């Protein structure tokens, strides 16, 4: 899927987007169609993309990184694992398998903000944080430990290749 990661420099989690919202919408709608449809309507998916771009700019997190990770974690928003669509948990935060659904947020906006703010914490220890939106503590040793997408492996998830897998989703989004 996408461009081989080994041939590319690392991808920063923080910064300006390399893509437009229209490119991201193509990625989201194509991905969900290929998977047999999403748990949400196309309108909700478009609203989700808009929220990632708006909140990503506020949080200084690249929206395509958040959307790529969300596509991986939710199975292109089919929510066939432990996390349900009604939780607005876009990255499986707190879901550790065995039926444990993880964190829930009250709205799409808060779910996107919680996801992107958590990514920001992994990428930078110096940024100010509203810890209430995070709803789950993050060990201090992880704050700023993953400035690049590839560095998420073994931290966000146990797999050492997790970050490389997320990068492949982001590459697919960028090339959509």
Mark where each language-model region is:
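Catalytic cores of secreted/periplasmic lytic hydrolases that degrade extracellular macromolecules
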Residues: 1-176
């Amino acid at each position: 899927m996408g461009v081989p990661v080994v041939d590319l420099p690392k991808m920063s989690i923080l910064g300006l987007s390399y893509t437009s919202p229209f490119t991201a919408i193509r990625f989201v709608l194509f991905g969900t169609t290929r998977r047999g449809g999403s748990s949400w309507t196309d309108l909700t998916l478009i609203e989700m993309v808009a929220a990632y771009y708006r909140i990503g700019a506020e949080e200084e997190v690249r929206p395509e990184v958040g959307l790529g990770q969300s596509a991986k974690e939710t199975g292109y928003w089919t929510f066939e694992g432990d996390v349900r669509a009604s939780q607005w948990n876009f990255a499986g935060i707190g879901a550790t398998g065995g039926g444990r659904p993880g964190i829930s947020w009250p709205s799409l906006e808060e779910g996107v903000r919680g996801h992107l703010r958590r990514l920001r914490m992994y990428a930078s220890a110096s940024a100010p944080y509203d810890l209430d939106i995070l709803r789950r503590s993050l060990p201090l040793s992880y704050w700023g430990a993953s400035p690049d997408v590839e560095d998420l492996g073994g931290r966000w998830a146990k797999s050492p290749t997790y970050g490389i897998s997320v990068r492949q989703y982001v590459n697919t989004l960028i090339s959509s």
